[in-house]
């Protein structure tokens, strides 16, 4: 099977780290071992600096980051990662497993922030072209459950400190996008861990069975 780009998405506390390990184990059981791991924003020297700027609550002092400036920083980090890490890895025949990609921007900025969705789609197409993940695994969790888990991890970043309404809008947009795109598979991440693990493994296995040899 040719190399593929698989992305794990979801609200804070959805369980993306655990899901990544389950994806890796499922791929390994199918004989796939050459993998590259990415996160967004981040994954390159430049992208990690942008990550600090956009997520660190102290990064800009008293200066509030404008919503459109935030979008552009996310895309700057994303383009750098795609062009210098993800595309070269895929060209080498490696599989890429990503913690977030463009769906996050469409959900968080388009849903949570309420930024014009046509503008976001136009910007995405301008900088990414037709580049898309082969599969996106969306871990659906309510904001109440997700934020409770996130708080248990420790100090929240700038995005994680947004209001419950922000995360409700973000989740609604995630669900809307997932319903419209067959390359996005949804897993109920509010279930007990063993049930989530079972569903993730089954989803990956089913998707792999659908792919050409």
Curated annotation (Swiss-Prot):
One of its GO terms (molecular function) is ATP binding. Keywords: ATP-binding, Kinase, Nucleotide biosynthesis, Nucleotide-binding, Transferase. One of its GO terms (biological process) is dTTP biosynthetic process. Its EC number is 2.7.4.9. Pfam families: Thymidylate_kin. It catalyses: dTMP + ATP = dTDP + ADP. It comes from the Bacteria. One of its GO terms (cellular component) is cytosol. ATP binds at residues 10-17. Belongs to the thymidylate kinase family. PANTHER family: THYMIDYLATE KINASE, UMP-CMP KINASE 2, MITOCHONDRIAL. Phosphorylation of dTMP to form dTDP in both de novo and salvage pathways of dTTP synthesis. This is Thymidylate kinase.
């Amino acid at each position: 099977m040719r190399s593929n780009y698989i992305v794990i998405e979801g609200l804070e506390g959805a369980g993306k780290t655990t899901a990544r390990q389950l994806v890796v184990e499922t791929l390994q059981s199918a004989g796939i071992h050459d993998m590259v791991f990415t996160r967004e924003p981040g994954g390159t020297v430049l992208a990690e600096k942008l990550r600090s700027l956009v997520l660190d609550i102290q990064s800009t002092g008293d200066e509030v980051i404008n919503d459109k400036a935030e979008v552009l920083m996310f895309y700057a980090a994303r383009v750098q990662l795609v062009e210098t890490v993800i595309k070269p890895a895929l060209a080498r025949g490696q599989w890429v497993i990503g913690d977030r990609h463009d769906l996050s921007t469409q959900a968080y900025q388009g849903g949570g922030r309420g930024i014009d969705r046509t503008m976001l789609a136009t910007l995405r197409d301008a900088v990414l072209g037709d580049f898309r993940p082969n599969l996106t695994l969306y871990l659906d969790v309510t904001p109440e459950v997700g934020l409770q888990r996130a708080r248990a991890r420790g100090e929240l970043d700038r995005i994680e400190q947004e209001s419950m309404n922000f995360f409700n809008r973000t989740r609604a947009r995630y669900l809307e996008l997932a319903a419209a795109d067959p390359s996005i598979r949804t897993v109920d991440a509010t279930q007990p861990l063993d049930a989530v693990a079972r569903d993730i493994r089954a989803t990956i296995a089913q998707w792999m069975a659908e792919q050409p040899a």
